[in-house]
Every structure is written in C-alpha cells, then in structure tokens.
Amino acid sequence: MVGPFCSASVCIDLKGMKNGDRTGFAAYNGDSGVLTVEKNKGKKELVMSEQYSVFGDNQGVKVIKEVKTKEMARIPLKSNRIYLRIDGEFGLGKDWATFFYSLDGKQWNRIGEPVKMVFDYRRMFMGSKYAVFNYATKKLGGYVDVESFEYK
C-alpha cells in the first residue's frame, strides 16, 4: 500500500468453496482489517473484521500472545462472485484503510468502519500491505478462483 492514497480490488469466484472454507482480502500492518467470505452449512456470508495482536514478553523478546478479532459487519451472500476493495489513505495523521464490496464490480458498498493502519517499525511489519487469502477450517478440497487484482 502506497500513500498518500491507494486502492486495490479483487474479484473472487466462490463456486468451489466447501463448508468451513474462508477466503478474502485484507490490509495489514501488524493489526489488520479483513474482508472474509465464510461458507458454513451451505450458506456464504461476508464478514468485515479488525484483527489486532496482543503482545507480551518472553525473556526480553517481544512476542504475540494472542490475536483478537472485532467483528464489525456480517451480511448474507447469495452470489458466487464477489468484488472486494480496500482504499488506503496515508496523509498526515490519517493512515486508514476503508473497506468495500460489490456484486458487479461497478456499484460499491462500504462495509464496517475504517481501520487504523498503525505504523510501528518495532512491531511486525514496515508498511501496510494487501493480502488475498483462502483456507479450509474443516476439510481440504475447496478452492476459489481469483479472477482479477487491480491496484491504483
């Protein structure tokens, strides 16, 4: 993610998801803002959450003790294709990521609240980044197709 302003979007085909699968798009810099499509009991939902690390000390070394999740929004999803977008604003005193979704790639809906992208070189990462992900929580075999990634 590059300032003072940037925007990235992905189009994901969800037809191959199995129950328990998770896929999505995130902005992270130690703490994260995450758009996740979850499939459970044959139904898909889009979840917007903030994930943040709780640090501790292990013999003088800073370590992550746990990662906490704050869910900000959850909506049912009937489509087998979704567009996810994250806008970054890195002006003086801003450092925000704002999250959007679309079912057609044209009309965008904001979801959740902006997430502060905390820049702290002593923690995890130098600079905010985008991430596209897909994983199983129950059984292997599901998949998604990332049809596009656009960055401005």
Residue ranges of model-derived segments:
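Extracellular glycan-recognition regions
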Residues: M1-K152
